Regions:
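C-terminal accessory helical subdomains adjacent to catalytic cores in phosphodiester-
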Residues: 2-17, 23, 37-63, 67, ...
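Long alpha-helical, hydrophobic tracts
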Residues: 22-25, 29-32, 36
């Protein structure tokens, strides 16, 4: 797992913005940049739909890969929920990054079935007393897929290739980051994709990416519960 992919295993921790300070840890500058840009993308869609002055806070928690995320899931959930640091814990990981040693998703044909199986597995390792305040979501197949919803932001010579398939239909044999690297010749998350997150309209990606929609609408639902 490279340092630029570590952010994929962050979990959104809802907290009352006025009561709790930011829990963002000191992390490497590239990882911090990625987390900040992703949060801005989320808040650009979430905040306008909440009452004035009632924004919720979302704090990313860093993990070193999906295996580390799974190993620490139970402990981290207990840590943040037991002492009131968070109201809810929301997990977001790359679907294609889940180790087959944990759950072999190749036995499931559709993306929907893979997600159902992966979510069921992750919920099974969460103690029952926390499950009502835990949500697990997936980037299909990577966060970069969301940015494929904006072909106009990429060089003209590659736009036709980007629009040939729906963003979340980029398959596991060539996930979005590899696809972008192939068609662009060079691709670096922190200097290419992350520069797009703050300036694009999240609704465009939400309309084109059903599993991103599930994630964002779940965040909105939880945020409204805190009002």
């Amino acid at each position: 797992m490279t340092e630029h992919r570590a952010y994929r295993q962050w979990r959104a921790l809802f907290r009352n913005h006025a009561k709790l300070p930011s829990l963002l840890k000191e992390i490497r500058s590239a990882e911090r940049l990625v987390a900040e840009r992703c949060l801005r993308f989320i808040h650009n869609w979430l905040d306008p739909q909440l009452p004035e002055g009632r924004r919720v806070g979302i704090t990313p928690v860093k993990f070193q890969g999906v295996s580390n995320y799974l190993d620490g899931l139970q402990r981290k959930i207990a840590l943040y929920l037991d002492d009131g640091r968070a109201n809810f814990v929301v997990g977001l990981v790359d679907l294609y990054g889940i180790p087959a040693s944990r759950i072999d998703l190749s036995q499931y044909t559709t993306v929907k079935d893979k997600i159902i199986a992966a979510r069921g597995y992750m919920r099974s390792i969460v103690p029952k007393e926390y499950r009502d305040r835990f949500r697990q979501h997936f980037a299909v197949h990577e966060v970069e897929a969301w940015l494929l919803a904006y072909p106009e932001e990429w060089p003209p010579e590659v736009r036709d290739q980007i629009t040939r398939r729906a963003p979340e239909q980029i398959d596991l044999t060539e996930p979005p980051a590899k696809f972008l690297k192939r068609i662009l010749g060079r691709y670096k998350k922190t200097t290419t994709a992350m520069n797009l997150f703050p300036k694009v309209n999240p609704q465009v990606a939400i309309d084109k990416c059903p599993f991103l929609r599930q994630f964002m609408e779940d965040l909105l639902l939880l945020a409204k519960l805190l009002q």
